Amino acid sequence: MFTTVQPTNRSSLPDDLFTAIKELKRELNAVILAHYYQNSDIQDIADYIGDSLGLSQQAARTPADVIVFAGVHFMAETAKILNPDKLVLLPDLDAGCSLADSCHPEDFARFKAQYPDHIVISYINCSAEIKAMSDIICTSSNAVKIVNQIPAHQPIIFAPDRNLGRYVSQQTGRDLVLWQGSCIVHETFSERKIIELKVAHPEAKIIAHPECEASVLRHADYIGSTTALLNYSLKSSEKTFIVATEPGIIHQMQKSAPEKLFIPAPALNNCACNECPYMRLNTLEKLYLCMRDKTPEITISEDLRVKALLPIQRMLEMS
C-alpha cells in the first residue's frame, strides 16, 4: 500500500536543482534509480538507469540508506519488498501503471482458482498482491529464460501482459494460460504508420518491445526489453532505427550513439500517446521535493512483503 501524503511546501525551489539534488543525495546516503522511460533530466541525474530487471537487481544490492525510485509505483514497491529497512521514496504517488491496474487481486484470485495445477509466472509490472499470488516473477529481459526452465509437463499461468505472454509462448513453444492485461502505451502503436515509416526509411531497422501487439512485432527486425533494444542499437552497424517502445529510451540511445538516427514509432492518433503518462508524472522538481521532505514514502505490510518477496527472489536466482 502507499501513503497518501504528497510533498508539501513547493515554494522556494533552488535555482540549480541538479546541484541541490546531489547535495541531498550525499546528506541522505541516497541512491537514485531511474527507468529508461523517465524524462531526460531525471535520467541524467540518476545513479543507475535501467529496465525492470536491472533496477530490481540494483535495489537488491544497494548499500544506500534511501532509495529514490524515479519510475512507477510497482517499481518502488518492489524496491521496498527487497529492502524493508530502507526508506523508499517515489516522487509522485500518482505514477501508476495501466498494466498493473489491469490485474486486480480479487479478480486474479478467482482466475487462478480455475487452474489449480498451474504455477503462476507474473510479469514484474504488477502489484505486491499479485506478486504474493505468484510462484515466480519475470521481466521482459528474462521471461523466455525463466519459462524455459520450467519442466515441460508443468502448466503455466502467465500474467498480467497478454502481449508479452503471447510472445513468450511463441519463443518457448509452451501453451500458456494468459491473463488479458496490457500496456496502454505499447498497444497504441500504429502498424500502418510504422510501415509508412519503413517505406520512407527503407534502411531502418524496426526494434520493438514484446509488450507491443503481434501486428507490430511481426514487422520487427529485433524484439527485446528496453536494455536489449538499447544494446542492439548500439552494437548494430545500421544507422537508422524505428523504435517501438516508450520514447524515453531514445535519450540513452542518442547519448550513446549520437551519429545514429532513432525514430519513435508513431501512435494511432496524432498525439503523444506513445509517451507513458504515468512515467512522465515524475519531474526534477518532484524528485528534489521528495528527497527534501522524505515523502511520499512507500510502505507495505510485513505479511504481504514476505509473500511477495519469495517469487522475486526466485526470479533473481533464475536470471
UniProtKB/Swiss-Prot annotation:
It comes from the Bacteria. Binds 1 [4Fe-4S] cluster per subunit. SUPFAM superfamilies: NadA-like. Its main location: cytoplasm. Its cofactor is [4Fe-4S] cluster. Iminosuccinate binds at residues 35, 52, 123-125, 140, 209-211, 226. One of its GO terms (molecular function) is metal ion binding. It catalyses: iminosuccinate + dihydroxyacetone phosphate = quinolinate + phosphate + 2 H2O + H(+). This is Quinolinate synthase. The lineage of its organism: Bacteria, Bacillati, Cyanobacteriota, Cyanophyceae, Oscillatoriophycideae.
